[in-house]
Curated annotation (Swiss-Prot):
It is a multi-pass membrane protein. This is Solute carrier family 52, riboflavin transporter, member 3. It comes from Osmerus mordax. Keywords: Cell membrane, Glycoprotein, Membrane, Transmembrane, Transmembrane helix, Transport. One of its GO terms (molecular function) is riboflavin transmembrane transporter activity. The gene is slc52a3.
Length: 410
């Protein structure tokens, strides 16, 4: 039963960011055809942040109308919208832009936090099956001796229509997994809910009938009294929690807002192959980091802080190359392409590990700490995307260029 639940939790979790991650990995092909061009990622980051209105509305419903909102119905609705969005993208990508949604992970059981997180990004690397588009130069003659230089991209092995149909099927699998999870017997809730000690303590207090207390109840009271300090004791000081939350804001702001907005400017000058590999391999680094966190958890705040600094260093290099677009360092060289690809992979992998481990730490702290972790993550993502949007689309601090015909000084 445990293996089945783990598998279903992973299958359900992959639907959370599958459509969005798939859209990001497909950007090397999409940006060459849509009118937004290199600015498209900055639009997507802002559009994705609008999805935060959903959790906000759910929170307001819980506060204003407690007990009336069924989260399972909400998640069913969101998953169905995700399936529909993928189908619409397959048919209307050239005419309409839309962002995907992902189901809230609150319904995942406390005990299956890590497998759900791993499944959340499990299949985000599948778009790497696309072959990178080449960049041949096409010459044709007009009026005798006049040559016109045009950039043409070779089509990938799979069209965007096939790709988004595949994403729709994956979303259907996530929907089926959630349906199955809702119908499994929940015999494991007693061991995962924090409400159990409170209910046991009411039995121990003997409020209903103080004169009647069996030996088993007395033994249960003794066990509960010994376990209670372990459940209520906080393992981190206020300074440490502040550091953790600031790290959550920074890591999510960087990975979900600042850097994704400029990935095209950072990678495209090195060619479509470098952009394709950066997007695909960075998506692979995400689930790999989650799996590493499952088997090699490291809760040391010093280690996580150093890892965060290292990831920030890679992020700084990526941002610097984007600022130098369309003529970054080591352009048109194999070394430059390799460095930018590895920089994006290590940036994503290191900070993904930090995000997972910080979530595990705050999960063990308390349920409210984990809720505030989610709030801090969304705040950081929102700040990052809001900062980058005007810099790219209004102030034009990042310049696009033609990957084949742009001439840069030596």
């Amino acid at each position: 039963m445990a293996i089945l639940i783990y598998a279903l939790a992973c299958a359900f979790g992959l639907g959370s960011w599958l459509a969005i991650n798939g859209l990001w990995v497909e950007l090397p092909i999409i940006v060459t055809t849509l009118p937004e061009g290199w600015e498209l990622p900055s639009y997507l980051t802002v559009i994705i942040q609008l999805a935060n209105l959903g959790p906000l509305l759910v929170t307001l419903m819980h506060k204003l109308c407690p007990g009336r909102l069924k989260e399972s119905v909400v998640i069913y609705t969101i998953l169905c919208i995700g399936v529909l969005a993928c189908f619409l993208l397959a048919f209307f990508l050239g005419r309409d832009n839309c962002g995907g949604w992902g189901p809230a992970q609150r319904s995942l059981l406390h005990h299956y936090f890590l497998p759900g997180t791993s499944g959340l990004h499990l299949l985000s690397h599948l778009p790497a099956l696309h072959d990178a588009a080449a960049c041949p130069l096409h010459h044709h003659t007009e009026g005798g001796d006049t040559y016109v230089l045009q950039t043409q991209y070779l089509p990938p092995n799979f069209t965007t229509e096939v790709f988004f149909f595949f994403l729709a099927v994956m979303m259907c699998i996530s929907l089926a997994a959630f349906w199955k999870l809702n119908r499994l017997p929940r015999t494991f809730e007693v061991s995962t809910e924090n409400l159990v000690p409170d209910s046991v303590s009411s039995v121990c207090s003997g409020l209903d009938n103080p004169a009647v207390r069996t030996n088993s109840q007395k033994h249960l009271c003794e066990v509960t009294s010994q376990a209670r300090p372990l459940l209520t004791k906080s393992g981190h000081s206020m300074f440490q929690l502040t550091f953790i939350y600031l790290m959550v804001v920074w890591v999510n702001g960087t990975t979900n807002g600042l850097l994704p907005s400029v990935q095209t400017y950072s990678c495209m000058p090195y060619g479509n192959l470098a952009y394709h590999l950066s997007a695909a391999l960075a998506s692979v680094a995400n689930p790999v980091a989650c799996i590493v966190a499952m088997f090699f958890p490291k809760r040391s705040l010093v280690f996580l802080g150093l890892l965060c600094v290292m990831g920030t260093g890679f992020a700084s290099y990526n941002m610097a190359m984007a600022a130098m677009s369309p003529c970054p360092l080591l352009q048109k060289s194999a070394l430059g392409e390799a460095i930018i690809v590895l920089s994006w992979v290590f940036f994503t992998g290191s900070l993904s590990y930090v995000k997972v481990m910080v979530g595990v730490i705050l999960r063990d702290e308390s349920h409210s700490a984990l809720v505030w972790c989610g709030a801090a993550a969304q705040i950081g993502s929102l700040i990052g995307s809001v900062i980058m949007f005007p810099l790219i689309n209004m102030y034009n601090l990042f310049q696009s260029g033609d990957t084949c015909s742009t001439k840069c000084p030596l």
